[in-house]
Amino acid sequence: MAKERALTLEALRVMDAIDRRGSFAAAADELGRVPSALSYTMQKLEEELDVVLFDRSGHRTKFTNVGRMLLERGRVLLEAADKLTTDAEALARGWETHLTIVTEALVPTPAFFPLIDKLAAKANTQLAIITEVLAGAWERLEQGRADIVIAPDMHFRSSSEINSRKLYTLMNVYVAAPDHPIHQEPEPLSEVTRVKYRGIAVADTARERPVLTVQLLDKQPRLTVSTIEDKRQALLAGLGVATMPYPMVEKDIAEGRLRVVSPESTSEIDIIMAWRRDSMGEAKSWCLREIPKLFNGK
């Protein structure tokens, strides 16, 4: 018990100051104490731990190997203690320590980068921006693993506590490589025609919810990939057909790397922001005000 009492945050702060300032006198000046008080604290620590922390053979204060080890590991504790204090103070003011924004794969993560420095200027809230696919985004919100979700409006809500707001409308186009045989089929394309060609899809990331598929027919052969960029690359490689967000393939279409299969297959979907009303903090409220500004004019 004596050893536990001796190794206090105060003692570790004294050791840290001595190392950074190079002497007991300079450390005492930084800490607003007299050198004899620091000497007493260190001597008491040495006695109770039964170790030698300082090499006192020279003119300059030097740590022994044991002292250096205790200092370096102690700094980890000091950093953790400081962070704990900061987080507690922030939480007391109503600012969350962590906030998770989940974007569905159709929503580009870089669109949210302007939030990061703005939020950091207001609080020490740690921000996570995570991508999920289809039902995986909504599952995170339902299970409390997301504070805010930005995703296509799937027209389902699992709780009256979930609120939402439309951000913008996204146009989707049905595309394939320019030499894909589907372009030789007569329009409008029937399901009998479409089912002959491999569809490319991004895997739903839901763990417990029933997984969803969009724009794929039951008996259609398919290639499933992990990301929307993998889906685009598979299209460019001529491996199949798929619906893609127009902004993600606009340049590919303009430069002839992809071609719209059927203009009649073009569709629009609302992208919404959703959140739980039963868990509101300052950081979340701030983000709910700021996120719509990122999409003004879309």
UniProtKB/Swiss-Prot annotation:
Described function: Positive regulator, may be partially responsible for expression of neighboring gene dlsT (yhaO).
Domain of life, per lineage: Bacteria
GO BP annotation list: positive regulation of DNA-templated transcription initiation; regulation of DNA-templated transcription
KW ATP-binding (keyword) present: no
DNA-binding region(s) in UniProt: 24-43
Protein's organism: Escherichia coli (strain K12)
Protein name per its UniProtKB record: Probable HTH-type transcriptional regulator YhaJ
GO molecular function: DNA-binding transcription activator activity; transcription cis-regulatory region binding
Gene designation: yhaJ
Positions of the HTH lysR-type domain: 7-64
SUPFAM superfamilies: Periplasmic binding protein-like II, Winged helix' DNA-binding domain
Keyword Iron among UniProt keywords: no
Key words of the record: Activator, DNA-binding, Transcription, Transcription regulation
Family of this protein: Belongs to the LysR transcriptional regulatory family.
InterPro entries on file: LysR_subst-bd, Tscrpt_reg_HTH_LysR, WH-like_DNA-bd_sf, WH_DNA-bd_sf
